[in-house]
């Protein structure tokens, strides 16, 4: 398989490794990106890749709560100029209120529901597109429920570039639930705790760490012990309750939650545009296109 400059660039972005190392890794693994990451890690060249998806598309996240129900959604636009537009911000609030009140199962069902004036949600969004002049997309949403004995934690970072919704069970301390949401926004854990990590993922990490230790020339008799120690650090990176609490690093998130008399039932974290590839236009051209379009 031909190794392209774009593939090398992507691997460099994901691992921080040098260009020649990335090219060699891709060549050795026949262009398989995931295997190339493992190859670099096993050689000790790259740290554990936080396979963060490239954040590209624009828009906002938004959170709406009403009693024991809460909703988090993401509405995309083509540019961040539009995301700051009053019409866009009014639309996201209207959609949030509708979705929380009507609880559709998914985006497809939501688009067919009737909103104000007998229009469908899809028609309502299309009207906003006609006024604003950009493609707008209701990308995703999630509705979460709790009891009177629980608390929601809602946090929007940078005006909605990242949105996090948490549920603290057995405690009505909304401030604590929000503090956990702020931690999640900053650190981006993949799981609540170790039990949520699949056996396959743990075994894969164990194999990579074992090969890494052997390549470092460590004696086989101490490799297993080293690997278990490094696995602990792996869990700290991806499991929320194992992480040092951002607001008090001397305490784990688990200890903070327990000190409030609750348990963390779940969380949802949206970052605008994660996983969406954006057309890489020249920025000056993008601005000129907008100026021309406004004439």
Swiss-Prot record:
Main location: cytoplasm
Pfam families in alphabetical order: EF_TS
InterPro entries in the cross-refs: EF-Ts_dimer_sf (IPR036402), Transl_elong_EFTs/EF1B (IPR001816), Transl_elong_EFTs/EF1B_dimer (IPR014039), Transl_elong_Ts_CS (IPR018101), UBA-like_sf (IPR009060)
Protein's recorded name: Elongation factor Ts
Record carries keyword Cell inner membrane: no
Function text: Associates with the EF-Tu.GDP complex and induces the exchange of GDP to GTP. It remains bound to the aminoacyl-tRNA.EF-Tu.GTP complex up to the GTP hydrolysis stage on the ribosome.
GO CC annotation: cytoplasm
Species of the source: Bacillus cereus (strain G9842)
Subcellular location: Cytoplasm
Gene label: tsf
Superkingdom of this protein's organism: Bacteria
Alphabetized UniProt keyword annotations: Cytoplasm, Elongation factor, Protein biosynthesis
Protein family (similarity comment): Belongs to the EF-Ts family.
tRNA processing found in the keyword field: no
Disulfide bridge partners, by residue number: none
């Amino acid at each position: 398989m031909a190794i392209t400059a774009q593939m090398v660039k992507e691997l460099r972005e994901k691992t921080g490794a040098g260009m020649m190392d990335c090219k060699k890794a891709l060549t050795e693994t026949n262009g398989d990106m995931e295997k190339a990451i493992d190859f670099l890690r096993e050689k000790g060249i790259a740290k554990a890749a936080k396979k963060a998806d490239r954040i590209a598309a624009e828009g906002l996240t938004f959170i709406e709560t009403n009693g024991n129900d809460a909703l988090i959604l993401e509405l995309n636009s083509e540019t961040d100029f539009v995301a700051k537009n009053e019409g866009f911000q009014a639309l996201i609030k209207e959609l949030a209120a509708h979705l929380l009140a009507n609880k559709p199962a998914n985006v497809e069902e939501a688009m067919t529901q009737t909103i104000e004036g007998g229009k469908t949600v899809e028609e309502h969004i299309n009207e906003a597109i006609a006024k604003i002049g950009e493609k707008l997309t209701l990308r995703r949403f999630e509705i979460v429920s709790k009891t009177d004995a629980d608390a929601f934690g809602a946090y929007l970072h940078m005006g909605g570039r990242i949105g996090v919704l948490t549920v603290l069970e057995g405690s009505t301390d909304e401030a604590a639930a929000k503090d956990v949401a702020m931690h999640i926004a900053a650190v981006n854990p993949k799981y609540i705790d170790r039990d949520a990590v699949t056996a396959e993922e743990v075994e894969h990490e164990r194999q990579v760490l074992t090969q890494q230790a052997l390549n470092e020339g460590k004696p086989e008799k101490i490799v297993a012990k080293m690997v278990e120690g490094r696995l602990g650090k792996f869990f700290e990176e991806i499991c929320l309750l194992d992480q040092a609490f951002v607001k008090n690093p001397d305490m784990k998130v688990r200890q903070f939650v327990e000190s409030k008399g609750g348990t963390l039932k779940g969380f949802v974290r949206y970052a605008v545009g994660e996983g969406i590839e954006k057309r890489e236009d020249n920025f000056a051209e993008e601005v000129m296109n907008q100026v021309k379009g406004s004439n």
